[in-house]
A protein has these predicted regions:
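Surface-exposed, low-hydrophobicity beta-strand/loop segments enriched in small/polar/acidic residues
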Residues: 1-75
Length: 75
């Protein structure tokens, strides 16, 4: 899928597996329910660090200073 730079409340194309790469500086990946009713989790990331994150298709990611790539879609 297409790379999304610095996502804010983004479901990353409804992907269920997302590759996140911190670009340039430390950041924090924040995962929330689609309606904003619940914080699912926060992951601090060092500059240059990357992770893969499993989520529900509708969950939303906010992650400044990052690139997020959808890599899987499971329904």
């Amino acid at each position: 899928g297409d790379i999304i730079e610095n996502p804010t409340n983004d479901n990353i194309g409804s992907a269920t597996l997302v590759y996140i790469s911190a670009a340039g500086s430390a950041t924090e990946a924040i995962l929330e329910k689609a309606d904003g009713s619940a914080l699912i989790g926060r992951i601090k990331m060092a500059s240059g660090q990357s992770i893969t994150l499993v989520k529900e298709a509708t969950d939303k990611i906010t992650c400044p200073n990052s690139s997020c790539t959808p890599i899987a879609y499971h329904w």
